[in-house]
Amino acid sequence: MDTRSGSQCSVTPEAIRNNEELVLPPRISRVNGWSLPLHYFRVVTWAVFVGLSLATFRIFIPLLPHSWKYIAYVVTGGIFSFHLVVHLIASCIDPADSNVRLMKNYSQPMPLFDRSKHAHVIQNQFCHLCKVTVNKKTKHCISCNKCVSGFDHHCKWINNCVGSRNYWFFFSTVASATAGMLCLIAILLYVLVQYLVNPRVLRTDPRYEDVKNMNTWLLFLPLFPVQVQTLIVVIIRMLVLLLDLLGLVQLGQLLIFHIYLKAKKMTTFEYLINTRKEESSKHQAVRKDPYVQMDKGFLQQGAGALGSSAQGVKAKSSLLIYKCPCHFCTSVNQDGDSKAQEADDAPSTSTLGLQQETTEPMKTDSAESED
């Protein structure tokens, strides 16, 4: 494929440069989260879910007293089960525009986009790549290479686009994961406190009657009891607690961010569009100010330097770089290149969907969403 600039150049929706390597959208459109190749974020998601489930239901809940044990099984089990269901639904749904689902043959490769014929991928609500009429909220996702109705963002954690068809399942996935993390932290803290105060409270299972050594604990109760030393239990508990806290911080940020978006009646895509416009306006204002000069990391006013090189870099970064609160789901190109998008409404450097088209092939430093 020729990726040189020129009006006669035919390219796929977006060609993006990541660490000096040109990355192109898939020629075969993705159907849902199970379309190959699976992103490694998705593999990590399932590995963490399985690992935390085993630790919760086979190691730590069996240590609880009988009165708390069954409550923990019901509450935590219900949350984990609900999370599994909504996660699967969010991944399995095809979020494409209704006309795309009705008329598109997913086994056929996508056509190349000819910039000499069309200024935009979507014009007058018609996609020149999907060859269908789409609704006003539809965007053409560069990661799935198809039009997504009510496009919000492309989530690598579920390996699927998030649009109007699966948004609430995605939101429920995040909310239930956060609730599950909170339940697990409560269980871990209870086990830790009881171990320090009265370890016998954690040894109420009948199988402990045959264990005389107080430094010996049983894991994977009640089906496959395995005897281990206290140090092993402590190491497992600390690793699970660390993983749980890290996950809770990220999921909590993401959940709060999407609650904020719903309160503002915005999508992630629209939020990034507006934010990038504000950042661009601030940057332009600084560049036009004759008393403020930013050059090679120095912030100067007139002839007098106001800070060191490091301070200048920090000040410059604060004006030029924006990081989305949901950075584990989405990322936005930070080089200020307006050639990263294609659409009919407003230009943007967000890499979540295709907005304003230009006459040159799109080359950006950041190419994909990170969920």
UniProtKB/Swiss-Prot annotation:
One Pfam assignment: DHHC
Any GO CC annotation of this UniProt entry: membrane
Gene Ontology molecular function: any one: protein-cysteine S-palmitoyltransferase activity
Biased composition (Polar residues): 347-359
Keyword Acyltransferase: yes
Gene Ontology BP terms: antiviral innate immune response; protein targeting to membrane
Compositionally biased intervals (Basic and acidic residues): 360-371
Subcellular location: Membrane
Record field: transmembrane: 43-63, 70-90, 177-197, 216-236, 239-259
Membrane topology: Multi-pass membrane protein
Catalytic residues (positions): C155
Entry keyword set: Acyltransferase, Lipoprotein, Membrane, Palmitate, Transferase, Transmembrane, Transmembrane helix
InterPro entries in UniProt: Palmitoyltrfase_DHHC, PFA4/ZDH16/20/ERF2-like
PROSITE patterns: DHHC
Catalytic activity: L-cysteinyl-[protein] + hexadecanoyl-CoA = S-hexadecanoyl-L-cysteinyl-[protein] + CoA
Region (Disordered): 335-371
Domain DHHC residue range list: 125-175
Annotated family: Belongs to the DHHC palmitoyltransferase family.
UniProt free text on domains: The DHHC domain is required for palmitoyltransferase activity.
Record protein name field: Probable palmitoyltransferase ZDHHC11B
Species of origin: Homo sapiens (Human)
Organism placement in taxonomy: Eukaryota, Metazoa, Chordata, Craniata, Vertebrata
Name of the gene: ZDHHC11B
